[in-house]
Amino acid sequence: QRQMCIRDRGMATGENSSVCVQDFGIDNRTAADGLAVGRASGFVGGLMRPFMSGCYTLQDERMYTLLAQLADTEDLYLEPSALAGMYGPVLTQPGQLLGAYTETALPAGALANATHLVWATGGNMVPREEMQRYYAKGKALAQQ
């Protein structure tokens, strides 16, 4: 995986701004430009830690695929970084990456009636030609 959200790594470990992505051999190049922070804020990490119970990262390829799927099913075009939140509910299902975590960290049935909110930003700010390239890339990746 080329990219990790250093904010999540810093908050999860309590290291906050004392670590950066380069410490882990990661180049900090990602389609998720809104999340491409190479060093997390210690101030924000300290404030958010009590409210955070888990985190995940996605590869750029997944975000592009989700971009194309959302455009095809909902006619909604978002920038790649906005799609990162879309995959969370999938990962919390039994047998998925965070499935075991949610089964132990949350009370039984806590997700049964959960509402998952995604901060869907930026699509209208992306030039049409660039969005078409994102979409085409997502469609091509989905065919693989």
Give, region by region, the residue ranges found by the protein language model:
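Active-site-adjacent helical/loop segments in soluble small-molecule enzymes
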Residues: 39-111
